[in-house]
């Protein structure tokens, strides 16, 4: 009971922060903002009904209408709907849930399919993932996906879902199945009806206390039988015989991306018994289940439907200075859900791009997901009545600034630390931007390599660094001393690709300093412009000072 209550409280807190945050407006400001949006929506209505034209996309109209309602309700404190977060737990899965890699488009899918055979397409059913464990012919355990390795014990709940077979026989008598618990629908047309918040509804039903009859509105779509029959046709037949009929009905053999596209489009427009958000293409040949790990499934991919764009309020405009000195602009957003992702930030780009967009805090922007699930701005759909735009920092930075710390160099200096600690450079595991900020704030680094001098005691006493991780971090810092010379040169920001640097065969600092512009220019992917940049870099006073400091620390390749 206490566990469920804690989960419920966290849901309510999360939900209220996402959906029920009201603008911090004075009564006069609220009246002005509401009145302006009201007038705009009325104008759109008049254009549509009186003149038969639409100046705004349906989705934008619907969401701005909902935003107007939200603003109006903010002043009478009406509650919002609950959105359920993902569930985690402590029950170990017999077989890990791998997850599925998403294909950006049909071309990407075609490339993936080219080297594979015996492929099958299934709908990507929108619900919550579950493991079903059968032992001696009976349902022994049901576990929520959680983090892929561990999840919640859902056995009691799943045993009350009449659509889930409680007993099985034959090859399934001692088996582990993976699938999706979904909300049963009658003739759901995805193209017309959308997602209807199905995942949150299923999660809500699975979390609700008591033996509710509403669980009978759920069913399961089995999409994996680890260590099951080798032939997909045999798997489907056995599953159907046991009562998992939907798997056989909605699994089709495909040979290429064109066939997948046809099925995907068919299911997008067809009447289905569940909500979907795309399709999954999987190979019948799978590795043994003991090799399954989260995020490492190479035998299946997903091709999702185009995500729905969302209108989001801009809460703040922030500026960041990258390691190369370029200033980028980021919009902090009131959280919105896009394709089951909570989006709170979107990259605008350069200062010039931000000025072209003319975005200020309080504006409403249309956000969607680009490839790889990265949020992007599609449009500015509404600008607030009172608009104050922050002043960007002076453009005083470049690729050769901020190797040494100073007040004006704070952001670029931190960006350099994040870069040198990344996997492709010095590989300092266990520390990111927040950790670097904590270390620099406490120990006031002189330059980007000052962390090499930190003692275990200093790390242990650093606010923001967990004491349990301080020893591991100190170990990582010491291991970095043994990294190859080229890694240290990359950490110093040499303007070369790793391939070009490796091809140079430079193995010492003295050798690098004596290399000519002509030498650098002959490297792969390095033209005259890049070669000149390398010369400017190695002749920079800060770089020379860092090289001498690393030599004093006896870093490989830098010693005299």
Swiss-Prot record:
It comes from the Bacteria. GO terms for biological process: DNA repair; DNA replication. The keyword Transmembrane does not apply. Its EC number is 6.5.1.2. Keywords: DNA damage, DNA repair, DNA replication, Ligase, NAD. The active site is at residue 124. GO terms for molecular function: DNA ligase (NAD+) activity. This is DNA ligase B. It catalyses: NAD(+) + (deoxyribonucleotide)n-3'-hydroxyl + 5'-phospho-(deoxyribonucleotide)m = (deoxyribonucleotide)n+m + AMP + beta-nicotinamide D-nucleotide. The lineage of its organism: Bacteria, Pseudomonadati, Pseudomonadota, Gammaproteobacteria, Enterobacterales. SMART domains: LIGANc (SM00532).
